[in-house]
Structure formats: structure tokens, C-alpha cells
């Protein structure tokens, strides 16, 4: 099951990459935005990406394993992702199709498929942290889904160096979200999720931004789950977006062994 655990850990991080990507501006055109304008820009541009395809490598470091692989990911809004793990010479080792509600993971070498429903209990068993599915996805990738915040101010808003800093407090759950957004490229550069006593549960760093169809994407992503002492590093080699021809065709072989998990 280690391969399945690696897949789940990686795919949750990749799932909403397109959520955190926003158009970039040249340095000379950058302007200082009010929190209201920044939030509106981030949310409006978040919705522009309809699909996403990327190829790259990921490396996972944890107490249980240290390993990496080459992968391909295809995401279709609003909530589906196809993920393929590649071995030497580009040979496929595993495939998966995931939605917000369900997942199916196919171990090609053993001709075995695992499938089931996604829920917060599964996430908590994997990540040992009490967060909802959407909160965990946002935390890993640094997306700013500000739909619920369009008409209210952040708990704190400031400028530090070349970054806007957006802070959101949830007093009921005793959680604090802090997003750092580059003033020039308007991309998420850092994200932290803190629990009570200001302890960091999850932290993400995003760098090596490149402009694709007037959208800035981080080609390097580092996410630390400090609760479980895990770290994943993602380096993209190629990214394409909004390809109308992009389709996912994933079917299990008739003789595959299927396990409900």
C-alpha cells in the first residue's frame, strides 16, 4: 500500500494547483492594491483556468519513506484529476482518477485497483491533521479560494518587502491562514496554516514562476506537513493550460483485481 499512500499524498497537493495561479504583470506595471482589489483579482483570475496538464518530478521525505518519481497530471475543472506515475524509460507504474467524492487508483505492475470514497476521515488517517478536504487542498497548493471572503476584509492585511500578506483567523477552530502574494507576479509565494499557540501545521513555498498564456505558474513547489513530519517537493518540466482538446481516457482492464478501500 506504500505506492497508494505516496499517490494520495502527492495528488492532494497537485489537485488544486490551478486554483493558485493568477496573471502576472511586468515590474514596471505593478501597483499597490487595496485588500479588496487584491482579493477580487485573485478570485477572478483563479476562475480563468479551465484545465491543466503538467509533467515533472516529485520527491517525498518522511519518517516512513524517502522516494520520488516522474509524473503526469491532468486536471479538469471543477473537480477531477488524472494522475500517472512513470518509471524508467517512461513506463507507467500507476494511474489514478480522482474527484472530490471518489478515487480509483490502479497499480499497473500488480494489475490491482483500489477505489473508494474520499472523506475527511481518510484524510485525517493519512495526514494526522483535522482539516476538511477543501482546507487541506488549499493549504498544500497555496490556492486562495476567496469566494467566501469577497465581501469581507481579511483579519490582517499588510505589505512586507515585495509581498502582500493576507491573514485569516478562524477563532472557532483556532486556526490561522497566512498567504504571501508577490506584488509583481500576483502569485502565492508562501502559505502557512497555524493552529493554537501559533504552531505551524502546514507550510508551502512556491517559486520559479513562469508566464503561460498570461498566467504565472510556480514550477517549483515545496510543501511541509509538520504534523506528520512530511515534505514533498514538486518540480515541473512542462505545463500547458486551457487546451480544448485535453481529455482523460482512463479505463481499468477487464481482468484487474478491484479492492474497495
Features from the language model and the residues they span:
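Edge/loop elements at the starts and ends of beta-strands within beta-rich repeat scaffolds
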Residues: 44-52, 64-67, 74-76, 96, ...
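An acidic-aromatic
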Residues: 80-134
Amino acid at each position: 500500500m506504500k505506492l497508494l499512500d505516496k499517490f494520495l499524498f502527492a495528488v492532494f497537493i497537485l489537485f488544486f494547483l490551478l486554483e493558485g495561479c493568477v496573471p502576472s504583470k511586468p515590474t514596471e506595471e505593478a501597483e499597490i492594491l487595496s485588500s479588496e482589489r487584491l482579493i477580487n483579482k485573485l478570485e477572478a483570475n483563479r476562475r480563468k483556468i479551465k484545465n491543466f496538464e503538467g509533467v515533472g518530478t516529485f520527491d517525498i521525505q518522511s519518517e516512513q519513506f524517502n522516494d520520488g518519481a516522474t509524473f503526469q497530471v491532468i486536471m479538469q475543472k471543477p473537480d477531477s484529476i488524472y494522475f500517472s506515475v512513470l518509471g524508467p524509460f517512461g513506463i507507467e507504474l500507476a494511474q489514478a482518477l480522482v474527484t472530490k467524492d471518489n478515487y480509483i487508483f490502479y497499480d499497473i505492475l500488480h494489475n490491482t485497483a483500489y477505489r473508494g470514497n474520499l472523506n475527511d476521515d481518510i484524510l485525517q488517517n493519512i495526514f494526522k491533521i483535522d482539516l476538511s478536504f477543501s482546507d487541506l487542498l488549499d493549504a498544500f497548493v497555496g490556492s486562495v479560494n476567496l469566494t467566501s471572503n469577497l465581501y469581507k476584509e481579511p483579519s490582517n492585511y499588510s505589505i512586507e518587502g515585495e509581498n502582500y500578506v493576507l491573514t485569516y483567523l478562524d477563532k472557532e477552530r483556532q486556526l490561522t491562514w497566512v498567504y504571501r502574494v508577490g506584488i509583481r507576479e500576483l502569485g502565492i509565494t508562501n502559505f502557512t496554516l497555524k493552529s493554537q499557540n501559533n504552531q505551524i501545521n502546514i507550510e508551502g513555498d512556491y517559486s520559479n514562476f513562469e508566464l503561460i498564456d498570461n498566467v504565472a505558474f510556480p514550477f517549483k513547489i515545496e510543501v511541509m506537513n509538520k504534523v506528520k513530519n512530511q515534505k514533498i517537493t514538486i518540480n515541473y518540466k512542462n505545463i500547458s493550460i486551457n487546451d480544448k482538446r485535453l481529455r482523460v481516457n482512463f479505463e481499468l482492464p477487464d481482468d484487474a483485481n478491484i479492492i474497495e478501500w
